[in-house]
């Protein structure tokens, strides 16, 4: 449970490359996420080419930290799933699993949503020549945190948001 409480959005990274086995464990964690009807609607693009990461930062005004990251991942939503109304929930669980595994590996991440933003979808679709069978869901910047205690605990618990048996 400590990993859940240590996860923070990290936007400053060292230049240290991420070991392939850590990337593999993050992807494995993502793919262990629950999904409606076990549809597993995810695919991933792993980007470690610096030039590509720098260009990727243009997909959103909120992606300014990307050029400083040694690794980026694009989480893709497979189309034509059995339970399409639930794919966003499935993908959210996969992204959270990936980010929690990153913390366990000593890494920091930040999640940049694509959502249903047509400009962001078009940018990523064109840049990565995505087929119609997938849509971009999220972009993650990943790296070793440049600041000490970047994944420090901040208590966000708010008892006023908890309701028992009725609202």
Q: Which positions does each model-derived feature cover?
A:
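Acidic, surface-exposed loops and disordered segments
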Residues: 1-167
């Amino acid at each position: 449970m400590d990993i859940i409480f240590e996860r923070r959005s990290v936007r400053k990274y060292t230049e240290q490359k991420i070991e392939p086995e850590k990337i593999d464990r993050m992807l494995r964690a993502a793919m262990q996420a629950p999904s409606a009807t076990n549809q597993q609607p995810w695919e991933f693009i792993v980007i470690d080419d610096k030039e590509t990461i720098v260009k990727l930062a243009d997909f959103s005004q909120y992606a300014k930290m990307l050029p400083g990251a040694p690794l980026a991942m694009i989480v893709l939503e497979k189309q034509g799933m059995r339970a399409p109304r639930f794919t966003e929930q499935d993908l959210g669980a996969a992204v959270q699993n990936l980010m929690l595994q990153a913390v366990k590996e000593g890494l920091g991440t930040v999640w940049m949503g694509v959502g249903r933003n047509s400009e962001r979808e078009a940018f990523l679709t064109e840049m990565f020549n995505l087929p119609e069978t997938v849509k971009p869901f999220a972009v993650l910047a990943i790296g070793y945190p440049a600041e000490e205690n970047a994944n420090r605990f901040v208590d966000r618990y708010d008892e006023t948001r908890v309701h028992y048996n009725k609202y």
